[in-house]
Amino acid sequence: VGPGWMNKMGRWEQPYELLYKSYSDGCAYYGKLKKEGQLIDMTMSEFADYYREKKGVNDNNYNEPECALWRDILYGSDKQLFWYCDPYMRACVNMDQGGAIVDLRPYAAKLEWPVGIGTKHVQDASYPFLIQEKYRAGYFTHYAGEGTVRSAKLSYKGEEVDLCLCPTHAHFSQEGKTRILTLDPVTIEFRDLTVKLQTKEYFEEGSSNIKIERNILEMSDPTAEVTLNEYMVACYGTTEYSEDMSNITLKIDGPEEKEIHYAYKCREEGVVGAKEVSAVIPEIETRVSMTASDETAEGYVKEGYAFSPMFTLGYRKTISDKEVFAT
């Protein structure tokens, strides 16, 4: 909220008098607290200095994350988002899309990103993303191909369901230095099979790791097997358009090594038993990788093309009732 709320040009739903009173009352309340010594007002630079001191940044021991499990109360949608931010990354998990990661920024690179007249970024002060749902469309993409998102798909007898289509809610907890997001189970219905699945997401302090665990709680046919495809579609940039990805290298480490040097040719490689799949993005000094809890899973990498330029890292695994698979 700022003084712009008090303009008289009819931009807001409320009348000017109400907006003026609301803003004035707010300022008066903060002023009263300041006079009583209960509040200190700071510029953003002053607050940054205060934050660094309080969090231990100045003593080189800053690992503690900021965590916020947010629920929409303004519009009554009952949607939930979870924000996680530490010196290594910022991530956003969207429970309305089944616990998909819809924003991911690799702070570990600590990029020098000068902004202003005379620099490469005259106005754009955003830190580059690997995943950004709003700019790169997420699951509900507006062009051919997939938008950036970290999610999973379940397949059975030719049918496929993405967990992005399974809204749910989550509960936050902490064990030691690991923050845990436990999602309510979702039910996936195929033509002749029903699967009840629960997701847990683990954020380990100071590690730059996110572990996503899928637990098959129940199947209508206990003998059935479904294919789980854990995937991450990503690119890099700060706007709706990804930057030039020609220098990106996609790699599979395992019994057999595979590499794709990005050329927008829509190529794909896969290796059963892959130890790791990864992408190196030199322009933002970032390496992002995925590993699997089961050595029999197939790791794969996919290259994009001009009109759907994002790369994909993923693991495919056949799973059955009561099985747990983590990446």
Per-region residue spans from a language model:
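Short, acidic/polar N-cap/turn motifs at the starts of alpha helices
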Residues: 79-83, 169, 178, 247, ...
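Short, exposed beta-strand/loop patches in secreted or surface proteins that constitute
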Residues: 72-75, 82, 164-176, 201-203, ...
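Catalytic grooves of carbohydrate-active enzymes
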Residues: 1-49, 295-325
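Acidic-aromatic substrate-binding/catalytic surfaces of carbohydrate-active enzymes
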Residues: 90-189
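C-terminal regulatory/interaction regions
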Residues: 36-39, 80, 187
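Acidic (Asp/Glu-rich), glycine- and aromatic
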Residues: 103-107, 186-197, 205-254
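Beta-strand-rich recognition/accessory modules
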Residues: 1-2, 116-119, 182-187, 211, ...
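Surface beta-strand/loop "capping" patches
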Residues: 52-93
